[in-house]
Structure formats: C-alpha cells, structure tokens
Amino acid sequence: MTTNTPLPHAPAAARSSRGRAVALAAVFLIVTLAGLMYVKWWPYYHKAANAADTHSIGSSILGGASSESMSDIWRSAYNYSIAYFKSVWKAAVLGIIVSSMIQALLPANWLAKAFGKASARSTLIGGAAALPGMMCSCCAAPIAVGMRKRQASIGASLAFWIGNPTLNPATLVFMTFVLSWKFTVLRLVFGLILTFGISYLAERFADRGKLGDLPNRLAIPEEPANRAPLALRWLKSLALLFLGIAPIYAVSVFLAGCLQSFMLPAWASEGIVAIVLFAVIGTLFVIPTAAEIPIAQSLLSVGTGPAAALLLTLPGVSLPSLLIVSRSFPKRVLLFVTLSVMALGVLCGIAGSLWL
C-alpha cells in the first residue's frame, strides 16, 4: 500500500511566499511614507508654523472671469486649471503610484481582511487610514479605486476617500490659526459625520448582486501561475491607471473651473439662498488641499453661513473626483454621497450662521 506524503519542499515554499509578501509590503510602506513625507508632511509642517505667525496660508485661488462672455469664462477656467495642477501635481502622481502599488505589490487577501467587510468596523478602519494621507479628494480618488479593485468594501473605500480631505489634520491646524477654533469645530463635527456616517450608510445603497463586478471593470486581470515579473506588473498597473484617470481628470478640472465665474451671483448674496448655492457649487468645484480656507476667508463679507458651507463642501468631493471613482462604486452610492455632501454643507452653513 502506498500513502501520499506531503512534498518536503512545500513548507519551505509557503514560507518563501509569505516572506516575499512581507518584503513587498515593506517596499509599499517605505515608498508611501517617503512620498507622504516629501509631498505632505514636511511642507505642511513649515506651512503650519507660518500660519501660526501670519494667520494666513496665502490668497484665494479663485480668479473668476472679468466679464460674463464665454471667452472670458473659458480663459478663467484655463488659468484656474493651470494654477490647480501646479499645486497638486506631486500629490496626484503620488496617489496614482500608491494605487498601482496596492494592485501590484499587496496580496488581495490582505486588503480584504482589513477593509473587506461591509461593517462599521471596516468603515472606521478606512477612515482612520485616511488621516496620514492629507490628500485632496482628487488625489485620494485613485487610491480608493485601487482599494476597490482589491476587494475593499464600499464603506471603507469611501471613508478613506472622503476622510483624506475632510479630516486632514494639517487643514484643521491651518483653519484654527487662520480663521478660528469655532470653524475648526464645525468642520471636524460635520467631517466626522460625512466620513464615517455617510460612508457607512452608503454601503446600504449598494446593489449586492452587482458588487462583485464593480471593482473588476478597470481591474488588472489575474496573472497566471507563472506571473509576469513584478516590475512589469507594476508598470502595467501604473499605465492603466494613468491612461484611465489623466484625461478625465484634466477635462473635468477645466469644466469645474468654469464654475468659479458663478460663485457669487448678485441675486444670492446672503441668507439661506446663498448657503444652498455655495453648498451645491462647493460640492462640484475642485480645489487643492486646504484651499478652502483662504476662499472662505475671502468670502466672510458675504456671511459666515456661506463660508461655513464651503469649508465642508469644497474639500468633501468634487466633479473630477466623482468621475475618477465612477466605475468603482455603484452610481446610486455616488449620488447618495453627492447629495449628502450638499445637504450637510447646508446644515453646516446654517450652524455657522447661527454660531460663528
């Protein structure tokens, strides 16, 4: 009688596979932390020190058209797009690199274990993971796409995407120095509701029968047993991400830039009408990280309500970031998130008009 005995090299192969996964995860962590240090943490440290001394982080990025003619509106949108991309290009590149590394370097089951369950815990972990990133919604969007391709849950991916701009610790510090602690409290309270509450509720809007297909619409096909070299797989992931995101990003930023010419019409300069208007436009408009602070500061003459509405809606989501993630989340989920940002922006504006 013959018996099947395990191959002697099987345990060694398993250990080798685990060791390789740990090594690749270490590479991912080192590159990500180094990128954040260069793009975010070190510059923001100096920016916070300057804000403490001067109570300013610069002037508003908004320009607006000199007239209502279409040529001036297009020119204004073009100038805004150039200023915007000059401000965010490093973070945008970092976001795409991190997303590609998530897909090429990290084992899929690792993210599924940490972020894969449709639960409050998974949403909480996703939001907490966003805090060191300090990215704007557009720069965090590719990472959320990468998380979805690796089977992270809707709630966790949304919390990471939304939490990056709305709970940005550096922005909260800047806001305290430039505006006041009351603005910071409003932003923090409504930011927590948006990041964790809305992200968790959005999971309930998903069609469970279609969830399995969504992350794979732009996903890299599974590699066969004799997988391609790691560098080739990473470059493939990076190229597909760039080609899928860059055109949408550029065009949508230009279109969003057209909105700055309509930020303050004469017929909506105060009261609830102004708050609603700013909440809607702020949700669709796109800004670099922390740019909502000088924008709100420059609009305080209109009222604290509209300024408070913009402090939440401008960073929360934007038309470009919604388009970037549009194939990774169900449409009804993104519609719910968009309307929720607008509604919370109105509530934040009303609270600001009464308290600030």
Can you name each region flagged by the protein language model?
Residues S99, Q103, G133, L194-S199, ...:
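Alpha-helical transmembrane segments of multipass membrane proteins
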Residues F28-D72, L94-L106, A202-E203, S252-M263, ...:
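Structural signal for alpha-helical transmembrane segments and their membrane-water exit/capping regions
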Residues S66, Y78, G95, M101, ...:
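Transmembrane helical segments that form the transport core of multi-pass membrane transport proteins
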